């Protein structure tokens, strides 16, 4: 497996050359509130998009904005012909429904792919899948285990891997420990997106040939970013955190925007 940072940089360079500065693409990021973690993610996304020559707009809303007021802003972006696509930075304040927000975003402007009618695939599973595909990973007939069943990662990841002819099992909070051990022991590919540090650790017997993609984002007591997996698992490849699936997600955001532009043309 190629180093993920090197892979992402090479793909971004190729996208920049493809766009060649001669494009009218514009992405807008809508951010509610001023949480430092979200600020960091937004800064990174802006940096990525600017590096490949895409114009950026940032709409910052106060944390106290009402749901209706936010939805009105999104509806304006839906009809703004200068905007190729946009995304709403998550998480949102508790008084705002992510489901309602996702349903308002027009499918042909949905960079994140969270609207049920969107052609785009949510960025994290798309990024993971595309990386594995570009690494010539042999999906067909192999056993995949996904830990987590969110609409953002687990469920769309399940569809991608199933469509690639893998035998896919989804583990979640109601899966017994006995079943978890069994499926993990036989897994060729493990995608971990549980949102809990240490969910996959060295207490489990894993195949030495297994590939582990750690999508988790957690912070330890020292405030350092860590994944859902214990480090240095005895497998063939384990994506790092940081510097792994987060980079793949950000790359997929760019690729989704380009795909939207191509579809809309």
Q: Across the structure, where does each feature detected by a protein language model lie?
A:
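Anion-binding alpha/beta catalytic cores of soluble intermediary-metabolism enzymes, centered on
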Residues: 18, 85-139, 180, 198-199
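Short, well-structured alpha-helical segments in soluble
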Residues: 69-81
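Short beta-strand segments enriched in small/hydrophobic residues
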Residues: 23-34
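Glycine-rich phosphate/diphosphate-binding loop of Rossmann-like nucleotide-binding domains
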Residues: 38-46, 122-211, 220, 224-229, ...
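Glycine-rich, N-terminal phosphate-binding loop of Rossmann-like dinucleotide-binding domains
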Residues: 90, 193-194, 215-216
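Rossmann-fold NAD(P)-binding glycine/threonine-rich loop
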Residues: 99-112, 213-264
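Positively charged, low-complexity intrinsically disordered leader regions
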Residues: 1-23
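Short beta-strand elements in bilobed, periplasmic/extracellular small-molecule ligand-binding domains
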Residues: 49-63, 168-171
């Amino acid at each position: 497996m190629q180093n993920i940072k090197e892979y992402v940089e090479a793909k971004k360079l190729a996208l920049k050359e493809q766009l060649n500065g001669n494009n009218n693409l514009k992405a807008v990021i809508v951010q509610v509130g001023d949480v430092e973690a979200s600020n960091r993610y937004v800064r990174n996304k802006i940096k990525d998009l600017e590096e490949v020559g895409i114009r950026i707009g940032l709409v910052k809303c106060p944390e106290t904005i009402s749901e209706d007021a936010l939805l009105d802003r999104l509806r304006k972006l839906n009809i703004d012909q200068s905007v190729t696509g946009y995304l709403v930075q998550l998480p949102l304040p508790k008084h705002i429904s992510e489901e309602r927000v996702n349903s308002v975003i027009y499918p042909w402007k949905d960079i994140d792919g969270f609207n049920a009618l969107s052609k785009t695939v949510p960025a994290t599973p798309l990024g993971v899948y595309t990386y594995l595909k570009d690494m010539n990973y042999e999906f067909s007939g192999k056993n995949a285990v996904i830990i987590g069943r969110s609409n953002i990662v687990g469920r769309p990841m399940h569809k991608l891997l199933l469509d690639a002819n893998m035998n896919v099992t989804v583990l979640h909070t109601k899966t017994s420990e006995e079943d978890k051990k069994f499926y993990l022991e036989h897994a060729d590919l493990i995608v971990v997106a549980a949102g809990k540090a240490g969910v996959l650790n060295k207490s489990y017997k894993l195949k030495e040939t297994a590939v582990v993609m750690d999508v988790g984002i957690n912070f330890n007591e020292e405030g350092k970013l860590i994944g859902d997996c214990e480090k240095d698992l005895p497998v063939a490849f384990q994506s790092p955190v940081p510097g792994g699936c987060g980079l793949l997600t950000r790359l997929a955001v760019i690729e989704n925007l380009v795909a939207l532009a191509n579809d809309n043309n």
